[in-house]
């Protein structure tokens, strides 16, 4: 078992996770510190802020609460497995599979 210790102090195995292993405070903390675009921006723009902006845009467009929540959580897996820039990510099928598993767990928790 390969685990990491999360912000909240819990042991987390990103390859064997279940919805019960996911804690929103761990996701929020990690995403607030993770810069979009591999850090190749002229200013710090966190994945967390991006997620909040996506949810706010969904609300401004009159989308349902469920759609707003989906927008908020669309990058939640990156809170545990970090981010890889899209030009590389598309070639990493194992990463995509793990990311999808995390996304499904987050959707389950949010009843999406």
Report residues per predicted region.
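N- or domain-start disorder-to-order transition segments that initiate the globular core
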Residues: 7-22
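Conserved alpha-helical "signature site"
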Residues: 1-4, 36
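Conserved small/polar residues in nucleotide/adenosyl-binding loops
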Residues: 101-110
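Post-HEXXH active-site segment of zinc metalloproteases
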Residues: 84-96
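Alpha-helical phosphate/pyrophosphate-handling elements in metalloenzyme active cores
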Residues: 40-66
